[in-house]
Amino acid sequence: MKLLTDFLPIILFFVAYRIHGIYTATEVLIVAAILLMAWQWWRRGRVETMTWVSTLLILTFGGLTLYFHNDTFIKIKPSILYVLFAAALLFTHWREEPLLQRLMGGQLPAALPLSFWRRLNGYWIAFFLFGAVLNLIVAYAFSTGIWVDFKLFGMLAITVIFVLFQAVVISRALPQEAKDGDSSA
């Protein structure tokens, strides 16, 4: 359910683009992002940091797109978001507890070494920087229609493949008892 609600603004953007074009799609994206924030607040009593950052960028770059009637602003928004994510991960990379460890640490055994968390953190930094560059290439080298398709389908596919790769990396790093379901109980 969470995955669907997180992707709903992008899906609505895609549908609105196909029906009415980039400027209506941008308006729909702005409204959908605000509604997602309201829904998170109503449902959980708080808004996730990622939703705050994404909505702020959507309001800023979507607003600039509509004000100047120039779709370049909305096209660079994903790249800026990816660079911000990479920067946040990089900022904590050499600290006692990398950001990724703080975000995922409760879901994995505490026995995983700091070197593992730094490696995983580094993979995500590289992924976000790759996504930022790839988005800019598609935004500037191809039509808006191709960029919209890439934004929904291309980046989604790349993200799924990367997450599967991360699952393999994590599963190989888990202690044997965690893989076996802690059979000592």
Curated annotation (Swiss-Prot):
Instruction: Work out whether the entry's keyword set contains Secreted.
Output: no
Q: Which keywords describe this protein according to UniProt?
A: Cell inner membrane, Cell membrane, Membrane, Transmembrane, Transmembrane helix
What GO cellular component is one of the record's annotations? plasma membrane
The protein's location, in the record's own words, is: Cell inner membrane
Which Pfam families would you find in this protein's record?
IspA
Q: List the disulfide bonds.
A: none
This protein's record includes keyword Transmembrane: yes
In terms of one coarse class, where is the protein primarily found?
A: membrane
Q: Which residues cross the membrane?
A: 19-39, 49-69, 72-92, 122-142, 150-170
- InterPro entries per record: YciB (IPR006008)
Q: How does it sit in the membrane?
A: Multi-pass membrane protein
Q: What does this protein do?
A: Plays a role in cell envelope biogenesis, maintenance of cell envelope integrity and membrane homeostasis.
Family to which the UniProt record says this protein belongs: Belongs to the YciB family.
Q: What is this protein called?
A: Inner membrane-spanning protein YciB
Source species, please?
Acidithiobacillus ferrooxidans (strain ATCC 23270 / DSM 14882 / CIP 104768 / NCIMB 8455) (Ferrobacillus ferrooxidans (strain ATCC 23270))
